[in-house]
């Protein structure tokens, strides 16, 4: 999941970003409204965590712009005001959720995850390939009934490939969807992560390399399972 945090209190913004990254999300940060606007014009985010009181361009203005962009980006507003009229006003601007500072961090993570599920097409409870299962909600991977311990990045890569339904995903797209803007596109990050992921998943191999194009889980192996 790709998330943008727009917050002018730098310590808070950085703390939120670190926490979301620890939960496996790819997170970018902007410290004012104009920077947030610039980032959203370049990158498609699943969720924007948006402070209302921002310099350069207010959170309200940025929220309005996001709502008219036609994207499926979801917005959760942060504010120090717990007045009912302020919450109503924020939601009327088009925000999907509203959280008052100070907040419990586990609650923020839960709300961001819930909004992220709404920002993407509905997925089945499980993504599978051969004898492998990935539960997107619980962030658990099993093969032949046994749990496979993956890092957050490995799990993110696997989830993107399984959800693609056999389509080829380039290294650049994986870097954009699983990492954040600080990832160096010229490094071997994706290749190294892929090697580790394949080793942990074991044999028979599930992930194919398409030379010059990227990676895929063949559609014959990958399927979506419903209840």
Identify the residue ranges that each predicted region occupies:
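N-terminal/domain-start alpha-helical segments
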Residues: 1-119
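Positively charged, aromatic-enriched patches within helix-turn-helix-type DNA-binding elements
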Residues: 140, 145-205, 211-213, 219
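Short acidic-rich active-site patches of cyclic nucleotide enzymes
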Residues: 96, 213-214
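The C-terminal output helix
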Residues: 113-126, 166
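Short boundary/linker motifs that mark transitions into or out of structured domains
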Residues: 128-140, 199, 213, 221-227
